[in-house]
A protein has these predicted regions:
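Juxtamembrane helix-loop-helix connectors linking adjacent transmembrane helices
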Residues: 22-30, 82-89, 93-96, 104-125, ...
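Small-polar-interrupted transmembrane alpha-helices in polytopic inner-membrane proteins
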Residues: 264-283
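Alpha-helical transmembrane segments of polytopic membrane proteins
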Residues: 8-10, 31-45, 88-102, 149-162, ...
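Membrane-interface capping segments at transmembrane-helix boundaries
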Residues: 3, 51-59, 111-114, 171-176, ...
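Canonical alpha-helical transmembrane segments
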Residues: 43-62, 79, 103-111, 165-170, ...
Length: 391
């Protein structure tokens, strides 16, 4: 397998260099030439080090760090050029499918970099949140209207992130526990989680923020107008954000603090804080500042909730589904994935106060009693330590 990944990595980089060279020769301006030269040098050096099978000495690791930084830029330029030039439907679909696995051979060479949790977080965010596949997929010319939302919504990028995350964490020795049975779960607790999921989803999307009583029990469904684009945007958020924050980040922090008394609480707190802060990027999409701050706080709190459910069930799909349900109904009721403008006073409306209390109290409940004991047991199974230390 390692030999195949090595030659895949080399071949992919050589193809990237050829495409960038051709793109600059065809370009009317030279604006991309400097960055293309830098990227070409980095890729050629990476190929050379891989061919020579150099040991990961400090200078080599420093170079690999810059290579990891440059990779999504290379992918973006290559895919942007191909997306604009390709007219063949079969080739466009082939390129879309290849985007799902394009990070795998690069990960093979950069795995020593990802053993550092700081690098793991930095490059996971850079590759699949700020840059990389999600921003590339919309540029592909997909002629079928029914398929187009899969790419314009960023959903295709979330699938690429899933493939990347599974390969990364398995390479580092972590287990994907979704495929294994979980024992000793309380039927009562699972029923409560299920009922809370349904009620919270409806409350979040349709609650009428009039007074303290109506806000709890009166729902308005008149604005519910789902579209394929909003649906796939919600699926993208659920799949991508849970894999990134609950699978990569949470498990990494659990391993770092495996000898700490408050291992679970610390891992949940820090991974949820990162999850919340990532939503600051919505400012770049034109979202209101106060609304974005509100979303950050909400995301941190829901991070507590989703982390506790994930660790209790041991199944990532449970929180992916919960996240998708929340976003599908919320996006379809507002007609947008962005929040409306808010004022400071809006923080203290019945709706927002209840939202805060629901998330906080449910998370505290999940992290106490017999549920906490089951979480401790599951944490021991969620990663399998290899001979090499993944931290």
């Amino acid at each position: 397998m390692q030999k195949r990944m090595k030659w895949w990595y080399i071949a992919q980089y050589l193809v990237f260099i050829a495409i960038l060279t051709f793109a600059n020769l065809m370009a009317e301006t030279m604006k991309n030439l400097p960055i293309s030269l830098v990227l070409g040098f980095i890729m050629l050096t990476g190929v050379t080090l891989t061919l020579l099978e150099k040991e990961p000495t400090k200078p080599v690791l420093v170079f690999r760090w810059f290579e990891a930084l440059a990779y999504p830029v290379s992918l973006s330029l290559v895919s942007s050029f191909l997306g604009q030039k390709i007219e063949s439907i079969p080739f466009a679909l082939f390129l879309a499918i290849y985007l799902l696995v394009t990070a795998l051979p690069v990960l093979y060479s950069l795995l020593p970099i990802f053993k550092s949790v700081i690098n793991r977080i930095l490059f996971s965010v850079q590759w699949f949140f700020i840059g990389g596949v999600p921003s590339i997929a919309p540029r592909l010319k997909v002629p079928y209207p029914l398929l187009r939302p899969l790419f314009t919504s960023g959903f295709w990028g979330s699938l690429a992130a899933a493939v990347f995350a599974l390969a990364l964490m398995r390479s580092l020795g972590f287990s994907f526990y979704d495929w294994k049975p979980t024992r000793k779960l309380s039927v009562l607790t699972l029923s409560f989680i299920g009922n809370f999921t349904v009620y919270f989803t409806l409350f979040n999307a349709f609650s009428i923020d009039n007074n303290w009583l109506d806000t709890l029990f009166v729902f308005d469904f008149s604005n519910f107008k789902p579209t394929p684009y909003l649906f796939w945007t919600a699926v993208r958020a659920g799949v991508f954000e849970e894999i990134l924050c609950r699978y990569i980040f949470l498990l990494s922090f659990l391993y770092i603090w495996r000898h700490q008394k408050y291992q679970i609480n610390l891992a949940i707190l820090v991974s949820s804080a990162i999850f919340g802060l990532l939503h600051i990027t919505n400012l770049m999409g034109g979202q209101d500042l106060i609304a974005t701050l509100s979303q950050v706080i909400f995301a941190i709190l829901i991070g507590f909730l989703l982390s506790s459910i994930y660790l209790y069930t041991g199944k990532l799909w449970t929180v992916i589904l919960f996240h998708i349900l929340i976003d599908v109904f919320a996006f379809s009721s507002t007609g947008s994935s962005m929040m409306e403008a808010m004022s400071i006073n809006d923080f203290f409306t019945p709706y927002n106060v209840y939202l805060f209390l629901f998330l906080l109290l449910f998370s505290v409940w999940m992290l106490t009693g017999k549920r906490k004991n089951i979480i401790r047991t599951n944490v021991q199974h969620l990663f399998e330590q290899k001979k090499s230390d993944p931290s």
